[in-house]
From Swiss-Prot:
The reaction(s) this protein catalyses: L-glutamyl-tRNA(Gln) + L-glutamine + ATP + H2O = L-glutaminyl-tRNA(Gln) + L-glutamate + ADP + phosphate + H(+); L-aspartyl-tRNA(Asn) + L-glutamine + ATP + H2O = L-asparaginyl-tRNA(Asn) + L-glutamate + ADP + phosphate + 2 H(+)
Stated role: Allows the formation of correctly charged Asn-tRNA(Asn) or Gln-tRNA(Gln) through the transamidation of misacylated Asp-tRNA(Asn) or Glu-tRNA(Gln) in organisms which lack either or both of asparaginyl-tRNA or glutaminyl-tRNA synthetases. The reaction takes place in the presence of glutamine and ATP through an activated phospho-Asp-tRNA(Asn) or phospho-Glu-tRNA(Gln).
GO MF annotations in UniProt: asparaginyl-tRNA synthase (glutamine-hydrolyzing) activity; ATP binding; glutaminyl-tRNA synthase (glutamine-hydrolyzing) activity
Pfam families: GatC
Organism: Streptococcus agalactiae serotype V (strain ATCC BAA-611 / 2603 V/R)
Name this polypeptide is given: Aspartyl/glutamyl-tRNA(Asn/Gln) amidotransferase subunit C
Lineage: Bacteria, Bacillati, Bacillota, Bacilli, Lactobacillales
PANTHER family linked to this entry: GLUTAMYL-TRNA(GLN) AMIDOTRANSFERASE SUBUNIT C, MITOCHONDRIAL
EC number assigned by the record: 6.3.5.-
Signal peptide as annotated in the record: none
C-alpha cells in the first residue's frame, strides 16, 4: 500500500508538524514500506498457534499496593523557576496558544 506525500502532510498538519518536501517524500516512502511489511505479516498462517500476550515471567508482575508518604511539596518547588498555586509555569511552545 502506498502512502502518499499528501497523506503525510495531512497527518503532519494534524500533529502540528512541518516537514520539508524531501522529508515528506522520505516519510511517505518509509511508511509505505512499513505498511507493506505489516500486510506481509497478515498473510502468515497463525491457525493453532497459542496467543502470546507477554514474554515476561508473570510471577512478579504484580506487587502489593502499599501507601507511602510522598515528598514535601514546598521542598519540591524550591528549584522551580516559576510557579503558581503549585503548578509549574513553563514558556508557551505554540505561537497562538494552540488547541493542544
Amino acid at each position: 500500500m502506498k502512502i502518499s506525500e499528501e497523506e503525510v502532510r495531512h497527518v503532519a498538519n494534524l500533529s502540528k508538524l512541518r516537514f520539508s518536501d524531501q522529508e515528506t517524500k522520505e516519510f511517505a516512502s518509509s511508511l509505505s514500506k512499513i505498511v507493506d511489511m505489516i500486510e506481509l505479516l497478515n498473510e502468515v498462517d497463525t491457525e493453532g498457534v497459542p496467543v502470546t500476550t507477554t514474554m515476561a515471567d508473570r510471577k512478579t508482575v504484580m506487587r502489593e499496593d502499599i501507601a507511602q508518604p510522598g515528598h514535601n511539596r514546598d521542598d519540591l518547588f524550591k528549584n522551580v523557576p516559576q510557579h503558581q498555586d503549585y503548578y509549574i509555569k513553563v514558556p508557551a511552545i505554540l505561537e497562538d496558544g494552540g488547541d493542544a
